[in-house]
């Protein structure tokens, strides 16, 4: 299957139906899908070119070119399924020189010729342990950026200055989920996620370093049904932290709720949640964080971030 698409939205176009729609854009896309093994293995190869050069008032229009490869393997019921996606995204604003003042002194470097590599790998593994049906989902996503001007030989006569900082952050995410269905009306989900952001920075010696910011989270949620699924009780807890140092933050949350089908299309819902923050540095920061008249102490480590209860009555037409 081959898809050819051309889209152009002028700078004067606005819509209230979709306020997030981007105007002043022109895009050409071509995709080809190939299926093998009786449609159990599919590949999608595509290319798109996008720019915002539709108006004379646009200075230094940005051109984006994307090459993509998506592959999916679904052998059949009860077998693991695998997804692998890859995108190479290039951006160029057409600027080929740096800005200088009237005396020829350097002002700034607005050139952009960057390349991003976005990869996604996902595998879903179904299985059973006795009467319990389980599905394990593993995901890995990585986005890395490269400054072409810094590495390509065609820019050798106009290289970057030593104090230039390429301000694009790499990211990496790993997640895992275990979904279980029991022989009685109970379903549970155990989740784990770790996200790392590598922010480029420059030290006092003009060496580029990357500062890592990472968040790790885990959660457990479950639902139980009563009276032929007319009453559904939900509960869960989650935990998130950015490390184990004195400056780190831990967030612990709990939730509970229920849905009750009063009539055929009338549903009564009750949901409640509470979230706590643990900030160890509050113990010795010289500030009365909990407003109890005492400066510093064990009681200032934990605090309630938010809590609430929502009661609603919904009718489905």
Which stretches of residues belong to each language-model region?
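Exposed, low-structure sequence patches enriched in small/polar residues
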Residues: 1-284, 290-294, 300-317
């Amino acid at each position: 299957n081959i898809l050819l698409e051309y889209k152009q939205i002028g700078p004067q176009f606005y819509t209230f139906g979709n306020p997030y729609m981007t105007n002043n854009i022109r895009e050409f896309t071509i995709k080809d899908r190939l299926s093998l093994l009786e449609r159990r293995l599919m590949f999608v190869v595509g290319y798109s070119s996008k720019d915002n050069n539709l108006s004379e008032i646009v200075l230094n229009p940005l051109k984006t070119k994307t090459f993509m490869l998506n592959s999916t393997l679904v052998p059949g019921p009860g077998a693991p399924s695998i997804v692998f996606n890859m995108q190479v995204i290039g951006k160029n604003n057409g600027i080929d020189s740096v800005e200088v003042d009237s005396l020829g002194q350097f002002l700034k470097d607005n050139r952009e010729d960057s390349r991003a590599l976005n990869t996604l790998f996902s595998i879903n593994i179904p299985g059973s342990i006795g009467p319990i049906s389980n599905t394990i989902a593993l995901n890995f996503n990585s986005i890395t950026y490269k400054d072409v001007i810094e590495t390509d030989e065609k820019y050798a006569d106009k290289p970057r200055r030593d104090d230039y900082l390429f301000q694009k952050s790499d990211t990496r995410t790993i997640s895992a989920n275990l979904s279980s269905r029991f022989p009685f009306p109970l379903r549970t989900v155990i989740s784990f996620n770790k996200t790392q952001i590598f922010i480029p920075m420059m030290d006092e010696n003009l060496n580029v370093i990357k500062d890592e910011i990472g968040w790790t989270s885990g959660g457990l949620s479950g639902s139980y049904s009563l009276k032929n699924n007319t009453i559904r009780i939900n509960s869960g807890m989650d935990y998130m932290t950015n490390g184990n140092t004195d400056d780190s933050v831990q967030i612990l949350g709990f939730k509970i709720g229920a849905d009750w089908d009063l009539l055929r299309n009338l549903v009564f819902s009750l949901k409640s949640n509470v979230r706590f923050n643990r900030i160890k540095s509050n113990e010795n920061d010289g500030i009365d964080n909990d407003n109890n008249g005492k400066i510093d102490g064990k009681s200032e480590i934990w605090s309630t971030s938010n809590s609430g209860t929502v009661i609603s009555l919904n009718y489905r037409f």
